[in-house]
Amino acid sequence: MDPIRCFSCNKIMKSPNEKGMVFVRNMKKEDREQFFKKFNYTRLCCKRMYLSAVNFQDELFQYENARSTLNVDGTITKPF
């Protein structure tokens, strides 16, 4: 997930494009610096938010329908 606010300074973190973090992580170091300057991310805490955020939504969605409940009598019930 793209961060909404910086955890340290509480600055609003806008995703400049629809690709978000993957776009920034795949850049070369020089290009990353230009990106941060262009969108005015000068503090290290804000840069850290972009470089360390993990996108795990897609992984969670694949398990959404796999939920099940183990009943007291040992049977398994699926919610849907």
Swiss-Prot record:
GO terms for biological process: DNA-templated transcription. GO terms for molecular function: DNA binding; DNA-directed RNA polymerase activity. Gene3D superfamilies: Homeodomain-like. Pfam families: RNA_pol_N. SUPFAM superfamilies: RNA polymerase subunit RPB10 (SSF46924). This is Uncharacterized protein 107L.
